[in-house]
């Protein structure tokens, strides 16, 4: 089943994520124990970065040309739970696929990713409950999805891309002039000439922010 579905499932995921942080939404997450994993991959131009995460944050920043470096921080309320959910990092023909699984449906567990990648990497990032913070060029295909959380995309000030941004319950903020459809919960148009790439971001419950870096 896909990590992302709109409507009722998104709301359920949001409630589940908040309850994993404590008994109510104002509680501080009790994820005392952590485990750090790190791996580097050699890639070419316009490499692919595919990430799917059941809960947590995904942060992507510009790194060295030809290298994708992935740091995963597993977090859990109980030390014994750290071995009960998995992180996979697999080299593709020209890129990296990173995924997490929580087959036991544990609560109070998550994985935070800190990734550095070439500026021209093409991301496909999906998070069930959590946030995505991406900084890149916007070249090629760029896709970001979360059911409950936020998507932040930082692009060059002179970027030329198509954009399709949709939010089910929440807000969209964009720091570029857009030619096309601009509504509170949907933006479908172009920034600049739109010839260099495409940005797609979808959030069921939360916010989308697209801004110059």
Task: Please give the residue ranges for each predicted region.
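Mid-chain, structured segments of secreted extracytoplasmic proteins
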Residues: 76-105
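Short, surface-exposed interaction patches in beta-rich subdomains
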Residues: 135-146, 150-213
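Short acidic/polar N-terminal linker immediately downstream of export determinants
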Residues: 21-67, 75-80, 103-110, 177-196
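Hydrophobic residues embedded in beta-strands of well-ordered beta-sheets
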Residues: 68, 94-96, 172, 208
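Repetitive beta-strand solenoid architecture
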Residues: 37, 45, 54, 64, ...
């Amino acid at each position: 089943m896909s990590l992302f579905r709109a409507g009722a499932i998104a709301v359920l995921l949001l409630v589940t994520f908040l309850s994993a942080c404590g008994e109510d939404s104002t509680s501080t997450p009790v994820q005392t124990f952590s485990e750090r994993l790190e791996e580097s991959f050699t890639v070419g131009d316009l490499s692919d970065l595919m990430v799917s995460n059941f809960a947590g944050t995904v942060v992507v920043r510009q790194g060295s040309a030809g290298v994708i470096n992935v740091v995963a921080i597993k977090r859990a309320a109980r030390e014994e739970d750290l071995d009960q959910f998995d992180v996979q990092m697999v080299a593709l023909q020209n890129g990296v696929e990173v995924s997490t699984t929580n087959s036991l449906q544990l609560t109070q567990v998550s994985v935070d990713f800190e990734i550095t990648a070439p500026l021209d990497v093409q991301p496909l990032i999906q998070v069930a409950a959590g946030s995505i913070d991406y900084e890149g060029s916007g070249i090629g295909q760029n896709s970001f999805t979360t059911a409950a959380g936020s998507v932040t995309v930082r692009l060059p000030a002179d970027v030329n891309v198509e954009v399709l941004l949709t939010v089910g319950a929440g807000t969209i903020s964009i720091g570029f002039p857009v030619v096309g459809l601009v509504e509170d919960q949907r933006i479908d148009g172009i920034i600049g000439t739109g010839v260099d790439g495409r940005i797609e971001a979808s959030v069921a419950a939360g916010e989308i922010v697209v801004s110059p870096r």
